[in-house]
Structure formats: C-alpha cells, structure tokens
C-alpha cells in the first residue's frame, strides 16, 4: 500500500486513528517538527515531536485554569507524536535518532528544540500516544545548539549546600 500523509496538528484525533497500522509520512505543514522530549531517547530510542514548536508548561504562558488546562492538553494531543525505533530493546547499543541522520553519541546529541521536516514509518498507538515506528535514521537538524563556552576571567561562582537529612539538634528530637 502507498504511504499516507499525516499533517500535524490534526483537527480531530480520529484522523490518527484512521491511519493506525499504515505507513505514514508525518509533517507539520510548512513548519518543521520540533523535538520536545528526548528523555527516553537513549533508553528506548524514542523522541517526542511537536508540530507547534517547543512546548511549555500551561501556567508558563497562561493563568491557572482547570478548563483552560484541559483544553490545552486536548490541543497538545493533536499536535504531538513520538518517533520510535521499532524496537522494544532497552538501552540499545546504537540509537538511530540523532542529528544529521547519524546515530546518537556523546559528540552527536539530540537536543530539545532541534527539528526535522518529515518522518516516515508505521503509525501505532501505545503508552503515551501515537508513534511512528521506523527503522531508518531520522535526519534531525541542530536548531538548538549548546551555548558557546563563556570565557570571563572576572566571573566568580559560589556554591553552598546543606544536608537536611542530617539536620538534628543532638537531643534525639528532629
């Protein structure tokens, strides 16, 4: 069967349901897909992507509101998809998804904010939503590079810590 196109964000979640189990090419229209979650990339080869750019906590841009937050989550669900390496292996020796279509490494990281134009694979639903299962490396572009090292001979840094686990006054009472 031919590969179907899935443009995010979808207007209704049924659009993804209708394509489940099919080969799809996912894009965000004229915008790139943005890396929003790389927490499980090294462990399971998964990358969270958004069609609406970098994601923020609801209250970072809005006043607290139960109804507003529910609407925000509903819209977010329509714009987010996971890229998966089609493997259930934990801590794989090679992680496919990093910058430039090369495997993940200490020298070739994947940062939130990096982008990709399209992803292609089989669409399925599990765990945290819809996923595109692919066995081909993704070609992420570095759009969120680490800041250059700041060289300032006048800079000073003072660190302080306090161990609250050992905080007692000696009389046996905490």
Regions found by a protein language model. Give the residues of each.
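Extended non-catalytic accessory segments flanking core domains
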Residues: 1-174
């Amino acid at each position: 069967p031919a590969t179907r196109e899935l443009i995010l964000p979808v207007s209704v979640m049924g659009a993804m349901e209708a394509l489940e189990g099919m080969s799809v090419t996912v894009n965000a229209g004229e915008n790139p897909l943005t890396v929003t979650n790389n927490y499980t990339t090294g462990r399971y080869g998964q990358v969270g992507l958004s069609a609406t750019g970098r994601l923020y906590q609801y209250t970072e841009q809005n006043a607290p509101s139960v109804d507003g937050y529910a609407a925000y989550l509903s819209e977010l669900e329509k714009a987010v998809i996971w890229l998966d390496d089609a493997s259930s292996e934990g801590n794989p020796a090679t992680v496919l998804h990093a910058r430039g279509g090369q495997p993940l490494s200490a020298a070739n990281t994947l940062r939130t904010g990096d982008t990709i134009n399209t992803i292609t694979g089989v669409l399925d639903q599990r765990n945290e939503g819809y996923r595109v299962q692919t066995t081909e490396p993704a070609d992420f572009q570095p759009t969120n590079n680490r800041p250059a090292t700041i060289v300032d001979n006048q800079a000073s840094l003072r660190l302080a810590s306090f161990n609250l686990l050992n905080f007692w006054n000696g009389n046996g009472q905490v």
